[in-house]
Amino acid sequence: MVVITIFTIMTGVVLANLPQFRDKTFLDLTAQEVAITIRQAQVYGIGTKVAGNEFKSHGINLDLTADSKMLTLFADYDENNAYDSGENIEQLRINGAANFTELDTSVDSPCTPASSQCRLDIVFQRPYPEAQFKFNNGASMAGGNIKITLTSTKSTYAKEIEVWATGQIIVRTKS
């Protein structure tokens, strides 16, 4: 009888925390997938990924005002260090209870999907692993870092994907 009671209590505790566990795990995996997509753009940019018959810079475009669930991997055909229509190679769509909620740079104030314009381009030019940032279609941002916040729509969990101009990519829990 004691064993059944202990088993019932343990099962109840585990099942009560299951939705939170799933939500947190989904957010962790999605943040890692975003970081891997950024790393893929870096590898394509410094490597030998051919776009047409040439080796082009590659990058990531994130436009929160257009779609807060979409990340685009692109080849920079016109070499303007920004995503233009028709340059996409692959699109990562977040299917689930998470959204990109904020873009923050080391030089500008953060923007959100509610902002009038909230767009980021991260470009890796061959043969260098360093990242170049273009924020809100403006001038390129020299140095520093950017933070992309991914937030769960079901809870208060949030992850930050931080990309440094040196090419380092970090995923951490947002505090």
PLM feature segments, named:
Residues R93, V123-Q125, T149, E162, ...:
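Generic structural detector for well-ordered beta-strands
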